[in-house]
Amino acid sequence: MTLMTVPAASIAGMVFSLVVSFALPIGLFIYAKKKLGAKAAPFFIGCGVFFVMVVMLEAAIHRIVFQLAGEALTGSVILYAVYGGLMAALFEETGRYIAMRFLVKPMDFPNAFMYGAGHGGVEAMLLCGVASISNIASAVMINSGTMSAQLASLDAKKAADTAAALSALWTTPSLTFFAGGVERLLAVVLHVSLSILVFRSIRKKSRKDLLNAYLFHFVIDSLAVLLSAVASVWVVELVVALVTGGAVLMAKYACMEE
């Protein structure tokens, strides 16, 4: 397969997603520290909880479940969406509650905000930031001719497989590469909002606020999977934005009561 030029607009989308994935969490960290008076520790607690609950524990459960019932889950979009939403809500919101109940001290609004920035921020860096770096590096190598030279040194099958994998960089619509950054922006906003809801549930001993945090997380993740099967990425992001907006409004209401 001949390598084609990766459009400049696609590379711009990759750069946009990269900047959002790293600059947004850092910006929120600075804002929470300087403007809200939050401590730095909750940010890193949020990062650590995401890594333990999602990267380690949730991923381990996924491996077991897919070994036992992988065909059943992947064979039904609805079942897969419900499963994914339940798992994400269960692990992330439970981790958020435990961390904010026992680790984040003092448990106040600024530190809840900081925790959310860390939890959502490290997710953005790992899921979108790292992928964007890889995409940009590959795109630059393709456009400069370096990648073609490297593929020439491989055996025919491996070179063809690598080229086929890289083809997404020039066949994917340029606008789609911006979607990763938009998705991460919304996700970070959601995590901050959910952290405020969980904070309020602890402060007010409100099961309703905690349940709402679980519910928002479940709904957003499930809808994203369901809509991805039938709609464009931008329709998915629009729906995610609307649900995230609901979480923001609920978190704002919680702040007004503090």
Predicted regions and their residues:
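Hydrophobic alpha-helical segments at protein termini of multi-pass membrane proteins
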Residues: M1-E258
